[in-house]
Amino acid sequence: MAARVVLDEFTAPAEKAALLERSRGRIEALFGVGLAVLGALGAEEPLPARIWLQLRGAQEAVHSAKEYIKGICEPELEEKECYPKAMHCIFVGAQSLFLKSLIQDTCADLCVLDTGLLGIRGSAEAVVMARSHIQQFVKLFESNENLPSNQRESEIKREFRQFVEAHADSYTMDLLILPTSLKKELLSLTQGEESLFETDDDVITVGDVRPPEYTQSAATGPSSARDEVVVQEDSRNKARTPVSELTKHMDTVFSSSPDVLFVPVNGLSPDEDALSKDRVCHKRRSSDTEERHTKKQFSLENVPEGELLPDGKGSAGNEVIDLSDPASNSTNLSPDGKDTTEEMEYNILVNFFKTMGYSQEIVEKVIREYGPSTEPLLLLEEIEKENKRLQEDRDFPPCTVYPDASQSRNAGVGSTTNELTADSTPKKAQSHTEQSMVERFSQLPFKDSKHCTSNCKVNSFRTVPVGQKQEIWGSKQNSSCTVDLETDGHSASAASASPKDISFVSRGASGHQQRNPAFPENGFQQQTEPLLPNNTKPACEKRSGSCSSPQPKPNYPPLSPPLPLPQLLPSVTEARLGGSSDHIDSSVTGVQRFRDTLKIPYKLELKNEPGRADLKHIVIDGSNVAITHGLKKFFSCRGIAIAVEYFWKLGNRNITVFVPQWRTRRDPNITEQHFLTQLQELGILSLTPARMVFGERIASHDDRFLLHLADKTGGIIVTNDNFREFVTESVSWREIITKRLLQYTFVGDIFMVPDDPLGRNGPRLEEFLRKEAFLRHMQPLLNALPSVGTFDPGFRSPSTQVANNSHQPPPRIQTSSSPWLPQQSHFTALATLPSMQQNPPLPAQRSSAETSELREALLKIFPDSEQKLKIDQILAAHPYMKDLNALSALVLD
């Protein structure tokens, strides 16, 4: 029932007159009212502090507009509300109609300040209501829950899609993939405001941006409403949205390749599929059949009437369909054009997930299992799970499988067969056939290996919907047991085919692709060479005993009755050991190789033993090391742990790793974050500050922390960065960048550093890592130990070999987990110096006369009384040292 027209007058601050004049058109369009700024009544001097305003329209609309105007003129609250960036389409998409509806519902003034940030002002009640709405939207978006079963989810999806496409813009695709519960909330928000704009004498539309005139009449009647619908439909047809553009492009692709065979999702037979090419898919359908596939029902509005289709036939009809007549929609459009839309929908879904980096086989498998009408976010989760499962299974190579492996899994055959059945046999009869098939095939020794030794040829297959009847086995079978199944892809010989078994393959391609045999010829399991590489044998032997030993089997007679595909598939697929992957990419990628290395377990082990005090502080650029180990694609925390363990084994105990704090957040590109936690608990990891402000990250430059710590501790920075931007900051930083950067490289999980960090003419690694003070202390001591050898600070060439061969470093056994260590004799001899001092004879001690002479000489050099006590302590602590220069150095330190 239309509301009564009312007239309301009220006052507002005079200084807001200019603001109201500028906002009048927007206010009238928002609330469907007429606004007049009357100003001050009479010619008063000076001008009053308030002016008069007048509103005319429906009673509820006038009340809402009045509250809104009061809120922008005299706001009680002004706040900001954050929301996820993925929800930005709600407030700016669909021509901002959802934002306008939120303003109409709450009477608060809302504006988008930035992506992820809204500004809210108005009365206290209006601001609280607006914030409550926004927080409810965020909760529904993050929970991503489906509607209860008693609510018609497909109807809500259809209504929302119709509404969004009627106001199409660049955010249409983002709006269509929102959760259904959020779609319902947005629809109720927009539909709840329609009653505000109905009056006795005029009808004002929310989306109309033109301000209504008081003199406008509503006498146009039903014809004007029909014309308005037609105009809206024309404008929607002209809107070039990403959906329509993609649809047009796919129309061209499919029309140019008429030989492409497509198995529809709805399970139509090939004959019905061929007949569907003669039909025209109209843009809009509102029939009940649309409820089956409501996700991504893309429009095909640019197919002209009477246009020839690829087979040369005309369109199904040239009748004009009135969009405002629901009867015509249900009677004329429900059976027609359905297959083409589902085909388009299916291919667009597949291409969408392929662009995200997932293989086509995995995407199609998940879509077949859950259906194309499932929420894309749910499909994405399942695709990610399937992808991870296949990558984990890839770690286990295929082995020979014996009949007990197939028989022990008969319980799971039924579910797989139900999903992949190609016959419309009743379930009870079908299960009986399955059981007989399993008993027959369980006697055969199935084998899935890289080197196939039988002559049986099996082509890869694809699943077909229930109800589509198909001859799987040919009527003629020769002695070589050739099995031809419906395939996609290109034809190839069995010897050159992919070694990985029967798998799901993509739709839309023609031809046949042969796979490696899955059955032995005449029942024999022939094996003339090992089935697996040497490095994979132990893993297989642990699971199945012996993988490569020949197992002769009795000669079974060839199969006489033809068996359908559904009964064959479970035995073949279940004949894999450990769930090995049924898909392998044709080419190897760096990402795949990196993920394979992560499957090899690595444990950070830092032994609790004293270190060496002669080594410099090690400052590790954690981000640089992690990115390098992750092949520039992942932040690999394992690389940091490997670097720390390397220096720990050298004897370093002063090790610091700097990593930005935001790297501790969950991220699919950050792997094995538990290493960061472990290092932080040990006090080795330091997190540089970072914070989030309005959805934007503010992080300090971690390289500055590296340079500051290296400057204070005299340490070495382990990084491959050149710090070019910091060369001019200070002299000390320039010295660090020039002389104290240690570069590195990774070979898999092996951490390696150069023997000559500063070039061929620079110091060796041992000298580079030692403190300078230690070199001064140890030189006289090594000179006094002839059996150990002369200590050469330059390490240009070894001077004297260690007398006792037992002190030579033991031969290093290289393993996959042990880091690479330098093998210089000086480095090892110095590391084992305490143990050496027990065996070689010590030189004679100083006599009392020599000690007195040295004391007098030192007192002449250091006459202070404080140094006198230190001189006595040094002489007592070093009874063998006779070098005056060495003793002087000790006094200085």
UniProtKB/Swiss-Prot annotation:
Keyword Hydrolase: yes
Residue numbers spanned by region CoCUN: 846-893
UniProt-annotated stretches for the region Disordered: 213-243, 273-339, 394-433, 472-564, 793-820
Comment, domains: The CoCUN region mediates binding to ubiquitin. Does not interact with NEDD8.
Record Pfam families: KH_N4BP1_1st, KH_N4BP1_2nd, RNase_Zc3h12a, UBA_N4BP1, UBA_N4BP1_C
Compartments it resides in: Cytoplasm, Cytosol; Nucleus; Nucleus, Nucleolus; Nucleus, PML body
EC number of the protein: 3.1.-.-
Highest taxon of source: Eukaryota
Biased segments, Polar residues type: 214-223, 405-433, 523-537, 797-820
Keyword Phosphoprotein annotated: yes
Post-translational modification note: Proteolytically cleaved by CASP8 downstream of TLR3 or TLR4, leading to its inactivation. Mainly cleaved at Asp-488 by CASP8. Cleaved by caspase-like protein MALT1, leading to its inactivation.
Biased composition (Basic and acidic residues): 225-237
Stated family: Belongs to the N4BP1 family.
InterPro entries, sorted: KH_dom_type_1_sf, KH_N4BP1_1st, KH_N4BP1_2nd, RNase_Zc3h12_NYN, UBA_N4BP1, UBA_N4BP1_C, ZC3H12/N4BP1_RNase_Reg
Record keywords: Cytoplasm, Hydrolase, Immunity, Innate immunity, Nuclease, Nucleus, Phosphoprotein, RNA-binding, Ubl conjugation
Bias kind Pro residues: ranges: 551-564
GO cellular component: cytosol; nucleolus; nucleus; PML body
Disruption outcome: Mice are viable, fertile and grossly normal, but develop mild, age-dependent inflammation and immune dysregulation.
Extent of the signal sequence: none
Lineage: Eukaryota, Metazoa, Chordata, Craniata, Vertebrata
Function according to Swiss-Prot or TrEMBL: Potent suppressor of cytokine production that acts as a regulator of innate immune signaling and inflammation. Acts as a key negative regulator of select cytokine and chemokine responses elicited by TRIF-independent Toll-like receptors (TLRs), thereby limiting inflammatory cytokine responses to minor insults. In response to more threatening pathogens, cleaved by CASP8 downstream of TLR3 or TLR4, leading to its inactivation, thereby allowing production of inflammatory cytokines.
Domain KH-like: 59-143
Source organism (scientific name): Mus musculus (Mouse)
GO biological process: cellular response to UV; innate immune response; negative regulation of cytokine production; negative regulation of proteasomal ubiquitin-dependent protein catabolic process; negative regulation of protein ubiquitination; negative regulation of viral genome replication; regulation of innate immune response
Gene: N4bp1
Protein name, per record: NEDD4-binding protein 1
Modified residues (Phosphoserine): S257, S269, S299, S560
Residues with site note (Cleavage): D200, D201, D325, P326, D488, G489, R507, G508
Domain spans labelled RNase NYN: 615-767
